[in-house]
């Protein structure tokens, strides 16, 4: 019961903090980001009022266009609402608009804008472009868009000029990557002296949250980047730097240069206040708005004790992924025109006028309304900004693919990062793959929105995936080549593989939202070296009737596909004749594999789940497949510990480690029943799987807990009269602080919550705290400050964070969990070193 009360108390504090008025940062000391689809409003100011049509609403500030003026007062009609100043637009006839046929690629901004006007005018409605490409990712995300006056709006003519942009063979498994093999004090060899990121294709690096070159380990964790020197006898945390305003999720390493790929807090308040110290945000986001922003942070590692941020590149858009090909990072982003000032009718009576107005919005739009922008900040504090891509570097597929912009930014990792070189396609992007001199980006094919059930069923039957191809042979630029389409949906990056001039794509027919009795999986072969659109040359199907794909791997002329619903058919596919691919073998076993890792030419390791004959999963299972005879694949051995555990290697291949010199496979493992969190080492030899041992991050009995400095002055709970309650609820490790109202306190390894006074009093009274004690608490909290409590993340549970990654460096197996880097000897797995981050 005491534990339950402690848990309830913790969540009650959290609810109190979250439920308080966040419009005033002094109320709780925290700042909550609004939902990105919410519409911030402002107070009407100025002498002019506005006219709003019945059934429509106008919200937010707008901008007066050059050469226009507002004459006379206007009136708000009954039943409508108006917030914010408005703009009157010049009156032009719709018949003046002349649209011309689209060009691929665009040669000028006028061509690009004409194409966008043509496609958008055909699809815009009373609710803007909402739904126009939503199924394929091409729709508009309304995020605090500005509204404009409706009554005086009709179409505008095309402007005489448009603002220009300002932006500058054999698939092989590898546990090392090109970007990690250089940069230490000695020339260590990846795959021999240390392991790198588990990548899909040899020589093509992939971003990850941890990187090493054998001499150092870099870890990006929340807003922090950590540098650990592992070149000596004892590992040393030499420096940690805060990535202020960014949440670094992945990074790429090349010598002494590190590229962190981060999300950025893209919110600007109505008063122009920015939620972070990132100066680029205020240049990209209008007051009262939110945008999805991605930042590339270049870090100089030459002085391990003094890491320096050299250059940052902040761009509008969502980060998809990145690859390093031919010495350059190819960073894939997708963005949409988020702030076109559409109106939305409050009822059906206003739909016709709203549609007319929204067509006008399309007609008056400029290139900057559609394409993403960027801000580059150099180490000396100078800024460069503009459109991320020039108009003549934008293309569109021959089939309309929505209004999103899929951009590939090329970054030379051997030189300081400058203004971006970008190529873009008017399409969305979800899954990327690189191989054979090309980068591929796959996404759901665009379809117009549907309303009735029969249309949904038809859409499911015709579900398709679009694939966009880019040439990456030039280290200084990425070039769009063409696009193609395959039926069904892909699982992940392993669904694609280029080999000998052909792209092989594995898909399950229908949409990704469940099982269909008539569904099946197919492998489609596309010609990849034509220099034009991807064209189908062969296909094989009828795999996994009523099932869907759970794992795919291509190795040379062979493909492996796992489907699952109740059992696990493991298929072998002969792709030696691209025009006539053939399913050669099928092995049915219980459970499934979620990740396939080729060991050599004849063995494949599958990491997944054991299951009953009815398909109910039972816990982690590792299977060793013999594929020496494609007509008769067999399962040589399995490892299944039971207990309902799982491994993140099932869905994130970077969590898997294969160390060939010792025939050792290492994977994270969590057993939710027992609470175990470990890394399991398995020896794969002589057709068997043998567990060597397990590594965990439980503190040793003689291990000192890392000291964490509280961010605010601490206060003795005894002074608050909370000591008895604290001990009774086993909260003896809690930290109480008095923090300024405008701060958001954080402590490594702790959950910190501001205690809003009224809610706190309600909870305290319910726990029996006397009014005298509550009065004492009130007197001890000075004006302008707030009471904050920080509870250890592992309190009450003896919980340890799951191990996320493992590395081999020299004679040690290194493992990483949140806040901790640990070394265990490869021989015996005894713990040899611990670094608390």
Question: Residues of each region from the PLM?
Answer:
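Conserved hydrophobic/aromatic packing and binding residues within compact polymer-binding modules
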Residues: 774
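Beta-sheet-rich non-transmembrane sensory/scaffold domains
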Residues: 19-41, 46-49, 54-62, 66-752, ...
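Sec-dependent signal peptide recognition
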Residues: 2-8
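C-terminal motif of bacterial Sec signal peptides marking the signal peptidase cleavage site
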Residues: 14-17
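Short acidic beta-strand-loop surface patches of small beta-rich interaction domains
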Residues: 777-782
């Amino acid at each position: 019961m005491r534990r339950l009360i402690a848990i309830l108390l913790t969540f009650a504090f959290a609810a109190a903090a979250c439920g308080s008025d966040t419009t005033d940062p002094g109320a709780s000391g925290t700042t909550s980001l609004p939902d990105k689809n919410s519409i911030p409003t402002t107070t009407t100011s100025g002498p002019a009022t506005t006219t709003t049509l019945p059934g429509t609403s106008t919200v937010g500030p707008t901008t007066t266009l050059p050469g226009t003026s507002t004459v006379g007062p206007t009136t708000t009609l009954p039943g409508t609402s108006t917030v914010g100043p408005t703009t009157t637009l010049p009156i032009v006839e719709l018949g003046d608009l002349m649209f011309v046929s689209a060009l691929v690629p665009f040669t000028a901004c006028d061509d690009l804008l004409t194409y966008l006007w043509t496609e958008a005018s055909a699809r815009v409605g009373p609710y803007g472009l909402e739904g126009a490409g939503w199924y394929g990712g091409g729709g508009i995300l309304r995020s605090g868009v500005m509204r404009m006056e409706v009554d005086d709006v009709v179409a505008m003519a095309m402007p005489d000029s448009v603002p220009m942009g300002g932006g500058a063979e054999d698939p092989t498994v590898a546990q090392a990557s090109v970007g990690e093999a250089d940069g230490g004090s000695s020339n260590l060899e990846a795959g021999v002296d240390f392991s790198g990121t588990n990548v899909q294709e040899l020589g093509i690096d992939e971003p990850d949250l941890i990187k090493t070159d054998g001499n150092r380990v870099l870890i990006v964790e929340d807003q922090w980047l950590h540098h650990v020197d592992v070149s000596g006898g004892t590992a040393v945390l030499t420096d940690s730097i805060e990535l202020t305003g960014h949440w670094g999720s992945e990074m790429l390493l090349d010598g002494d240069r590190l590229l962190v790929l981060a999300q950025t807090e893209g919110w600007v308040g109505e008063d122009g206040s920015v939620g972070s110290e990132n100066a680029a945000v205020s240049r990209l986001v209008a007051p009262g708005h939110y945008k999805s922003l991605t930042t590339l942070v270049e870090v100089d590692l030459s002085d391990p004790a003094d890491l320096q941020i050299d250059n940052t590149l902040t761009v509008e858009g969502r980060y998809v992924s990145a690859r390093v090909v031919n010495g350059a990072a190819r960073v894939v982003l997708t963005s949409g025109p988020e702030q076109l000032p559409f109106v939305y009718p409050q009822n059906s009576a206003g739909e016709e006028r709203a549609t007319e107005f929204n067509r006008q919005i399309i007609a008056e739009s400029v290139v900057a309304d559609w394409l993403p922008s960027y801000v580059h900040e150099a180490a000396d504090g100078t800024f460069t900004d503009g459109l991320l891509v020039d108009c003549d570097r934008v293309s569109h597929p021959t089939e309309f693919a929505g209004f999103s912009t899929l951009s590939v930014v090329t970054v030379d990792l051997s030189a300081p990062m400058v203004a971006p070189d970008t190529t873009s396609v008017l399409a969305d992007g979800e899954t990327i793959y690189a191989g054979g001199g090309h980068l591929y980006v796959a996404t759901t094919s665009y379809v117009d929105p549907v309303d009735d059930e029969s249309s949904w069923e038809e859409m499911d039957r015709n579900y398709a995936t679009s694939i966009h191809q880019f040439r990456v042979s030039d280290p200084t630029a990425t070039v769009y080549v063409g696009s193609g389409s395959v039926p069904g949906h892909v699982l992940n990056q392993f669904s694609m593989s280029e080999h000998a001039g052909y792209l092989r794509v594995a898909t399950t027919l229908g949409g990704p939202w469940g099982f269909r009795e008539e569904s099946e999986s197919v492998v489609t072969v596309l010609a990849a070296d034509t220099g034009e659109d991807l064209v189908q040359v062969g296909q094989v199907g009828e795999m996994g009737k009523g099932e869907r794909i759970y794992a795919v791997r291509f190795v040379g002329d062979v493909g492996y596909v796992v489907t699952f619903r109740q059992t696990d058919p493991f298929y072998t596919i002969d792709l030696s004749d691209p025009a006539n691919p053939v399913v050669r073998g099928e092995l049915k076993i219980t459970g499934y594999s979620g990740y396939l890792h080729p060991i050599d030419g004849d063995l494949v390791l599958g990491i997944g789940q054991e299951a009953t004959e009815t398909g109910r999963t039972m816990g982690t299972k590792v299977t060793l497949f013999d594929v020496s005879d494609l007509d008769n694949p067999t399962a040589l051995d399995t490892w299944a510990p039971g207990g309902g555990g799982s491994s993140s290697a099932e869905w994130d291949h970077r969590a898997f480690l294969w160390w060939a010199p010792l025939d050792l496979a290492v994977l994270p493992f969590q057993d939710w029943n027992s609470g175990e969190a470990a890394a399991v080492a398995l020896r794969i030899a002589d057709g068997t799987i043998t567990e060597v041992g397990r590594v965990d991050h439980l503190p040793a009995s003689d291990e000192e807990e890392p000291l964490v400095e509280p961010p605010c002055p601490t206060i003795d709970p005894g002074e608050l009269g909370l000591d008895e309650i604290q001990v009774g609820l086993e909260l003896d490790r809690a930290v109480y602080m008095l923090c300024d109202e405008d701060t958001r306190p954080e402590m490594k390894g702790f959950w910190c919550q501001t205690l809003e006074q009224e809610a706190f009093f309600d909870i305290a009274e319910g726990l029996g705290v006397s009014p005298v004690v509550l009065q004492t608490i009130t007197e001890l909290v000075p004006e302008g400050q707030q009471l904050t409590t920080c509870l250890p993340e592992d309190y009450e549970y003896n919980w340890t964070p799951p191990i996320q990654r493992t590395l081999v460096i020299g004679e040690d197996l290194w493992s990483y969990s949140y806040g901790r880097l640990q070394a265990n000897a490869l021989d015996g797995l005894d713990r040899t070193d611990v670094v608390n981050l």
